[in-house]
Amino acid sequence: MIFIVISIDTRPEKRDDFLAGITRYCAQVRAEPGTVRFTCSEDVEEPNRFVVVANYADQAAGEAHVASEHAQWFFGWLPSVVSRVPTIVYQELPGAGWSEMSEVRLESAT
């Protein structure tokens, strides 16, 4: 599995543009074969800082994503809305996906 986390700081005056673009992009990426998860969340303490979490089934799925028309659009468009170059963590991990967190157990309803 490919696991990617990207930190994106947007320019305050471009926030609405970023939200519109990332919403469109997320939907396109989620529809790709081999995408396990693709989400974008805003940091609760840093306004205009967003974190993208992307998981692909394998390297081939990740490569297909990067080559896609919408990814090429995103990479070209992103500089128009960010305040700094995004930072990224990229890891190839064993396994096929997410598993339950063993430290947490749900409370039963009474």
Annotate the PLM regions:
Residues 24, 28-36, 55-90:
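An amphipathic, aromatic/His-enriched active-site/gating alpha helix that lines ligand/cofactor pockets
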Residues 9-18:
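Short, surface-exposed ligand-recognition loops at beta-strand->loop->(often short) alpha-helix junctions
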Residues 13, 45-47, 57, 69, ...:
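Short alpha-helical
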Residues 39-48, 75-110:
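Glycine-rich beta-strand-turn "strand-cap" elements at beta-sheet edges
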Residues 2-8, 39-66, 103:
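Short, well-ordered beta-strand segments in beta-rich or mixed alpha/beta enzyme
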Residues 1-2, 17, 33-35:
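Short, flexible segments with low predicted structural confidence
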